């Protein structure tokens, strides 16, 4: 087995590293978004990773999700756990082969939604509101476009905007052509950017901790980082946009 220290040695001095390893991370939905997020955050070795999905890997999933031919017919949570073992030397995983729906309640420091339907997004949002979690990340994507929402508990205005403008009935969501719903390059990209939001959050935790210990801004050798409320990317124009 590859030792834990070797698998993180290239970034272990990052300002966010120590705080990231203290957090318990929930990833709900292991399709194109969740499977790629699990891989990226798994490489960081958080304190624990809690996975929820009740699906089985199918051949069609391989075109845009982090699975291989050997995973077909296996439960997604099992396939992702095995991938984290073999590719990340990471084992602090709670793999739940079930849907995250009522009456299931989960506590985690960070909650990440990789769902492909609005009812599940609404459920995890309400669960997050009632939890002790400080950060909710909601990823949404099509074949060549993605959106990432990041909500912090203190951002009451953004929470209101998200709840009233971005949670709507499933029938109101755009439905794409069956053979043009997902691409590997966009799935890996959104997984990376969601992980970027996660490490920015961890950087701010580290910064706030140093400030609370009496360090001045001049004494801290890194700056707090932005966490946009909404990040979008359009592959056709190769343009990122962020809103705060």
Task: Report the location of each language-model feature.
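Hydrophobic pocket-lining residues within nucleotide cofactor-binding pockets
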Residues: 62, 100, 141
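Conserved SAM/SAH-binding loop
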Residues: 96-102
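Glycine-rich phosphate/adenylate-binding loop
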Residues: 2, 22, 106-110, 114-244
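Glycine-rich adenosine-cofactor-binding loop
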Residues: 21-45, 50-56
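Glycine-rich phosphate-binding loop and adjoining beta1-alpha1-beta2 segment
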Residues: 48-88
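N-terminal charged helix/coil linker that caps or initiates catalytic domains
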Residues: 1-25
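Hydrophobic/aromatic anchor residues within beta-strands of the central parallel beta-sheet
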Residues: 90-95
